[in-house]
């Protein structure tokens, strides 16, 4: 039996190993950096005007905390009638804007409600403009503003109404109706004369 001497590998290898070459490259190629920091000198010149932009006015802002004008939410629950129907209340979803001053009478309280009273519903008012008026849904101009600015009221073949400028500009970007996205082009709409 022959006995072999086990050979051990040394970490780090010989002098010309890759790790040794890498270490020598890193140390020789790194430029020396000075560890001392130099302070920056600020030079003030006489006559420079300093402008304070933190305050908009010279007078202090005074907040009066002696009066409490606040919105009070009034929640009234609807009570069912005996026959099962709910009792209708006109001020069910309302709030009261009032002052805490006892000197002022409660007659000056303002009631704000989310429901439209019956009288305005019956008059035909559906929004900011009465029904029957024509407006462009893009620029929100009404008929009179459109005509005063030299534009026309136009309708697409799908029936949607716009001012001529808004529809022309919209068709430059996309060949579809701005409302329903049906494919149209500049030949697929016509002016409306009212």
Swiss-Prot record:
<keyword id="KW-0808">Transferase</keyword>
<protein>
    <recommendedName>
        <fullName>E3 ubiquitin-protein ligase RNF4</fullName>
        <ecNumber>2.3.2.27</ecNumber>
    </recommendedName>
</protein>
<comment type="subunit">
    <text>Homodimer (via RING-type zinc finger domain). Interacts with GSC2. Interacts with AR/the androgen receptor and TBP. Interacts with TCF20. Interacts with PATZ1. Interacts with TRPS1; negatively regulates TRPS1 transcriptional repressor activity. Interacts with PML (isoform PML-1, isoform PML-2, isoform PML-3, isoform PML-4, isoform PML-5 and isoform PML-6). Interacts with PRDM1/Blimp-1.</text>
</comment>
<dbReference type="GO" id="GO:0005634">
    <property type="term" value="C:nucleus"/>
</dbReference>
<keyword id="KW-0597">Phosphoprotein</keyword>
<dbReference type="GO" id="GO:0051865">
    <property type="term" value="P:protein autoubiquitination"/>
</dbReference>
<keyword id="KW-0963">Cytoplasm</keyword>
<keyword id="KW-0833">Ubl conjugation pathway</keyword>
<dbReference type="GO" id="GO:0005737">
    <property type="term" value="C:cytoplasm"/>
</dbReference>
<feature type="short sequence motif" description="SUMO interaction motif 1; mediates the binding to polysumoylated substrates">
    <location>
        <begin position="40"/>
        <end position="43"/>
    </location>
</feature>
<dbReference type="InterPro" id="IPR043295">
    <property type="entry name" value="RING-HC_RNF4"/>
</dbReference>
<dbReference type="GO" id="GO:0061630">
    <property type="term" value="F:ubiquitin protein ligase activity"/>
</dbReference>
<feature type="region of interest" description="Disordered">
    <location>
        <begin position="1"/>
        <end position="39"/>
    </location>
</feature>
<feature type="region of interest" description="Disordered">
    <location>
        <begin position="110"/>
        <end position="130"/>
    </location>
</feature>
<feature type="binding site">
    <location>
        <position position="163"/>
    </location>
    <ligand>
        <name>Zn(2+) 1</name>
    </ligand>
</feature>
<dbReference type="GO" id="GO:1990752">
    <property type="term" value="C:microtubule end"/>
</dbReference>
<dbReference type="GO" id="GO:0016605">
    <property type="term" value="C:PML body"/>
</dbReference>
<keyword id="KW-0539">Nucleus</keyword>
<dbReference type="GO" id="GO:0031491">
    <property type="term" value="F:nucleosome binding"/>
</dbReference>
<keyword id="KW-0862">Zinc</keyword>
<feature type="modified residue" description="Phosphoserine">
    <location>
        <position position="99"/>
    </location>
</feature>
<keyword id="KW-0010">Activator</keyword>
<dbReference type="GO" id="GO:0085020">
    <property type="term" value="P:protein K6-linked ubiquitination"/>
</dbReference>
<feature type="region of interest" description="Required for ubiquitination activity">
    <location>
        <begin position="1"/>
        <end position="20"/>
    </location>
</feature>
<feature type="binding site">
    <location>
        <position position="166"/>
    </location>
    <ligand>
        <name>Zn(2+) 1</name>
    </ligand>
</feature>
<dbReference type="GO" id="GO:0070534">
    <property type="term" value="P:protein K63-linked ubiquitination"/>
</dbReference>
<dbReference type="GO" id="GO:0046685">
    <property type="term" value="P:response to arsenic-containing substance"/>
</dbReference>
<feature type="compositionally biased region" description="Basic residues">
    <location>
        <begin position="1"/>
        <end position="12"/>
    </location>
</feature>
<dbReference type="InterPro" id="IPR013083">
    <property type="entry name" value="Znf_RING/FYVE/PHD"/>
</dbReference>
<feature type="short sequence motif" description="SUMO interaction motif 4; mediates the binding to polysumoylated substrates">
    <location>
        <begin position="71"/>
        <end position="74"/>
    </location>
</feature>
<dbReference type="GO" id="GO:0042802">
    <property type="term" value="F:identical protein binding"/>
</dbReference>
<keyword id="KW-0238">DNA-binding</keyword>
<dbReference type="GO" id="GO:0045944">
    <property type="term" value="P:positive regulation of transcription by RNA polymerase II"/>
</dbReference>
<feature type="short sequence motif" description="SUMO interaction motif 2; mediates the binding to polysumoylated substrates">
    <location>
        <begin position="50"/>
        <end position="53"/>
    </location>
</feature>
<keyword id="KW-0805">Transcription regulation</keyword>
<feature type="binding site">
    <location>
        <position position="139"/>
    </location>
    <ligand>
        <name>Zn(2+) 1</name>
    </ligand>
</feature>
<dbReference type="GO" id="GO:0043161">
    <property type="term" value="P:proteasome-mediated ubiquitin-dependent protein catabolic process"/>
</dbReference>
<feature type="binding site">
    <location>
        <position position="177"/>
    </location>
    <ligand>
        <name>Zn(2+) 2</name>
    </ligand>
</feature>
<dbReference type="GO" id="GO:0070936">
    <property type="term" value="P:protein K48-linked ubiquitination"/>
</dbReference>
<dbReference type="GO" id="GO:0090169">
    <property type="term" value="P:regulation of spindle assembly"/>
</dbReference>
<dbReference type="InterPro" id="IPR017907">
    <property type="entry name" value="Znf_RING_CS"/>
</dbReference>
<dbReference type="Pfam" id="PF13639">
    <property type="entry name" value="zf-RING_2"/>
</dbReference>
């Amino acid at each position: 039996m022959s006995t072999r001497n086990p050979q051990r590998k040394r970490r780090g290898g010989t002098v010309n190993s890759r790790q040794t070459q890498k270490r020598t490259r890193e140390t020789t190629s790194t430029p020396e950096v000075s560890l001392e920091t130099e302070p920056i000198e600020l030079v003030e010149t006489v006559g420079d005007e300093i402008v304070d932009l933190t305050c908009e006015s010279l007078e202090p802002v005074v907040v009066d905390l002696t009066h409490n004008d606040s919105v009070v939410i009034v929640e009234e629950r609807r009570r069912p009638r005996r026959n099962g129907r709910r009792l209708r209340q006109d001020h069910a979803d309302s709030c009261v804007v009032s002052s805490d001053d006892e000197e002022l009478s409660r007659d000056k309280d303002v009631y704000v409600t989310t429901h439209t009273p019956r009288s305005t519903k019956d008059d035909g008012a559906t929004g900011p403009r009465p029904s029957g008026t024509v407006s462009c849904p893009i620029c929100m101009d009404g008929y009179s503003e459109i005509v005063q600015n030299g534009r026309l009221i136009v309708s697409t073949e799908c029936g949607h109404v716009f001012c001529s400028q808004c529809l022309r500009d919209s068709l430059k970007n996309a060949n579809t109706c701005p409302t329903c996205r049906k494919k149209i082009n500049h030949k697929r709409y016509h002016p409306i004369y009212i």
